[in-house]
Amino acid sequence: MLSHVEMAPAAGGFKLFGKVIMQCGVSEGTQDKAQGFVVAREKVEPEEEEEEEQRVPAAATSGQRASIKREAADRDEEQRQGGGDAAGQPTQRRLQDSAEARAAAAAPLPCPRCRSRDTKFCYFNNYNVNQPRHFCKACHRYWTAGGALRNVPVGAGRRKNRPLGPLAVAHHNHHHRAAAGFVLGFPNPSSPTSPSPVYTDRWPVTPDRPF
């Protein structure tokens, strides 16, 4: 190494001919490089932080979406189950109500006219369980719960022979008597021209009228 060149370690430069020369360019370049590295690192770090922040919210949003989808699916299943139960409950209630109405209608009720217990349930009026139709066998009357008493002829529901009047009875007896007392008469072989005694009373022989 040259004798006239001495390094000045304390000042960071070298001594030339009794003068200390500082390494300004080198120091400035290194400082600039160091500053540039720091700035670049500072620039890179925020970008990485932003990317990490973006990744974290993206992961959070994906997790939230998955949880929201699961909650929606659970709600749909609950609604379906609840809807099925709600749809099945009214049907069961209707069946129970109809069964109770039929059981109540099947019980014999006293007739509102004659108070007889000899009654029977016929059917539901207008297919309504609240209007059971009953029939009284004693007075032959139909009535509906909550309705008016229906008048039915006494002979309804029974097939009977029609009663005969006095003229019909007389005509019937006359036919029976004629059938019992009618006798065929034949002429006597000795007198072929002589009429039968049966016809003699009905058609008497006279001179004006030949036989």
UniProtKB/Swiss-Prot annotation:
GO molecular function, one term: DNA-binding transcription factor activity
Zinc finger (Dof-type): 109-163
Basic and acidic residues: compositionally biased ranges: 68-80
GO cellular component: nucleus
UniProt-annotated binding residues for Zn(2+): 111, 114, 136, 139
Domain of life according to the entry: Eukaryota
InterPro entries documented for this protein: Dof, Znf_Dof
Primary location group: nucleus
Swiss-Prot/TrEMBL keywords: DNA-binding, Metal-binding, Nucleus, Transcription, Transcription regulation, Zinc, Zinc-finger
Ranges in a coiled coil: none
Residue ranges, annotated region (Disordered): 37-101, 191-211
Subcellular location, record wording: Nucleus
Entry function: Transcription factor that may transactivate seed storage protein genes in developing seeds.
Name of this protein: Dof zinc finger protein 5
